[in-house]
């Protein structure tokens, strides 16, 4: 555990250092690298990930897939509650904790989203949003292998969430833990199947479209749906 905490701290500090050194005039200084990773992800997705996700969707009936999605969403609520606390959003943290308890008990370990039926809002907060909430800039845009769009700040946040806050990481058995991670990623990809081809068809430059959409979406999320006007931090010209 001490080694794990040390790794988390080092990852966070390294990410924050890079964020602090980033230029705000052009937030895609890594574009050459990013486009290479984007192309790799696209090839891997079309060759392997998308077909497997399609088979997953075809084989499992909708109620089963909904249960899987609800289960992992419920685990994600735990991560959101921690980040709400770190952002001092105590009312949202209490609401999220109540949602987690309701779904974990009456929802049969989260397989059924009872809380949404009761009108309790589903929210998602992560450590990248927490850093943004406290004024940490996004840093350069970054495309992660297999994971897709991110930024230096959000990649740092993802590392902290994954290594410290995600309940799955505390599963002792490696086979069970890795299977849970793989199933969660497969479920998320299966949900995106209906819109998989729209990006290539609609955008002249899918990479630039994805980058701009991601950065604007994160700006919106960090400000809880009421963001100030975008400044030159998001100017990619």
Q: What do the predicted segments below correspond to?
A:
Residues 29-59, 73:
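Post-signal peptide N-terminal segment of mature Sec-exported envelope proteins
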Residues 51-55, 81-82, 142:
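Alpha-helical transmembrane segments of multipass membrane proteins
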Residues 1-10:
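Bacterial N-terminal signal peptides that target proteins for export
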Residues 74, 86-152:
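Mid-length scaffold segments of soluble, non-membrane domains
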Residues 62-88:
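A glycine-rich, hydrophobic loop/mini-helix early in the fold
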Residues 22, 129, 134-237:
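A structured, mid-to-C-terminal "fold-capping" secondary-structure block
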Residues 17-20:
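C-terminal motif of bacterial Sec signal peptides marking the signal peptidase cleavage site
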Residues 64-67, 87-94, 116-117, 221-227:
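Surface-exposed patches in mature extracellular/periplasmic domains of secreted proteins
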């Amino acid at each position: 555990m001490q080694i794990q905490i040390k790794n988390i701290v080092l990852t966070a500090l390294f990410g924050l250092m890079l964020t602090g050194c980033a230029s705000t005039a052009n937030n895609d200084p890594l574009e050459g690298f990013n486009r290479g990773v984007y192309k790799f992800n696209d090839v891997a997705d079309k060759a392997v990930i998308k077909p497997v996700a399609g088979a997953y969707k075809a084989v499992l009936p909708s109620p089963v897939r909904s249960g899987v999605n609800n289960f992992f969403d419920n685990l994600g609520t735990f991560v959101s509650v921690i980040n709400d606390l770190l952002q001092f959003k105590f009312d949202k943290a209490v609401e999220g904790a109540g949602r987690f308890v309701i779904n974990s008990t009456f929802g049969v370990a989260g397989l059924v989203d009872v809380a949404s039926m009761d009108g309790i809002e589903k929210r998602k907060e992560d450590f990248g949003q927490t850093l943004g909430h406290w004024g940490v800039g996004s840093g350069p845009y970054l495309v992660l292998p297999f994971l897709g769009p991110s930024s230096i700040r959000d990649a740092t946040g993802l590392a902290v969430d994954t290594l410290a806050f995600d309940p799955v990481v505390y599963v002792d058995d490696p086979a069970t833990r890795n299977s849970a991670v793989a199933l969660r990623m497969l479920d998320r990809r299966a949900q995106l199947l209906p819109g998989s081809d729209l990006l290539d068809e609609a955008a002249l430059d899918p990479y630039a479209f994805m980058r701009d959409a991601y950065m604007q979406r994160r700006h919106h999320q960090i400000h809880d749906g009421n963001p100030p006007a975008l400044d030159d931090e998001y100017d990619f010209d």
